[in-house]
C-alpha cells in the first residue's frame, strides 16, 4: 500500500482543486541591437534589452519582425521623430516607443490595451532603456476608438500648440481585421495636419493577406488617409511551420499614411 493510499480520505488534501491554475510563465527577455544610429540621435545607446510578457492573449510575449523593422526604420529616419510628438498604438514590448525617445522626440505616448501585466511591462521597458532625465515618454492603457482625452493630455501638458501627434505608429496591428475602423478613426482624429502614420505588418495568416491589405483601401476610401508603400521586404518568418506559405509569412510591409490634401 502506498503512503497516499494509507491516508484514506485525507489523501484528497493533496489533490489539486478543480479551479487550480498553474503559475503563469515567467517573463523572458529579448535583445535588440540598434544598427542605424545617426548623428542626430539624442542617445548612442546601442543595446536594448526588452522584457516580454510571459504569455499574453494580446501577443505581447513576442518581439515581432514588424516591431524590429519599425525600430530600424525610425532609427534611420530621425527627422520623423526629433522634436515631434509621437503616439504608438498597440505597443506590446514598446520597442518603437523606446527608439523614438532615444531619438529625441518631444513626447512619446506609448499605449496598449489596459491589461495590467502588459502596461506594467511597457513601463518596465521604458524605465530600463530610456534615461530618466529625458523625461519624454508617457504610457497609457487605451482601447482603440475610445475617448482621446487621456492621450491628448500628455502632449497638452508639455505646451504643444499643435494638439495632435506628428507621428502615429501602428506596428503589427492590421491582422486585427475587426478593429480596422477603430484604428483608422483613431489615426485620422489624432494625426496632425502634416503628420504621418507609420504602418508596418507581416501577414501572419497568409490566406487572409487580402483582408490585411483592405486596411489601406479603407484608409483611402473612407477615412481620406493616403497610403504610400515604403517597401516590402522578406525576412525570416516568425514560425517555421507550413513550407507552402513561408514566402508570404516572411514578408514585412511598411506604409505611410497622410491626410488627403
Swiss-Prot record:
Stored Pfam families: Methyltransf_16
Cellular localisation: Cytoplasm
Gene3D superfamilies in alphabetical order: Vaccinia Virus protein VP39 (3.40.50.150)
Binding site residues for S-adenosyl-L-methionine: 64, 90-92, 112, 144, 171
Keyword S-adenosyl-L-methionine: yes
GO molecular function term, any single one: protein methyltransferase activity
EC number: 2.1.1.-
Keywords carried by this UniProt record: Cytoplasm, Methyltransferase, S-adenosyl-L-methionine, Transferase
Keyword Electron transport listed: no
Any one Gene Ontology BP term: methylation
Family: Belongs to the class I-like SAM-binding methyltransferase superfamily. EFM7 family.
GO cellular component: cytoplasm
Purpose: S-adenosyl-L-methionine-dependent protein methyltransferase that trimethylates the N-terminal glycine 'Gly-2' of elongation factor 1-alpha (TEF1 and TEF2), before also catalyzing the mono- and dimethylation of 'Lys-3'. May be involved in rDNA silencing and in lifespan determination.
Name this polypeptide is given: Protein N-terminal and lysine N-methyltransferase EFM7
Note: Present with 7280 molecules/cell in log phase SD medium.
InterPro entries, sorted: EFM7, Methyltransf_16, SAM-dependent_MTases_sf
Stretches for region Disordered: 1-27
Gene from which the chain derives: NNT1
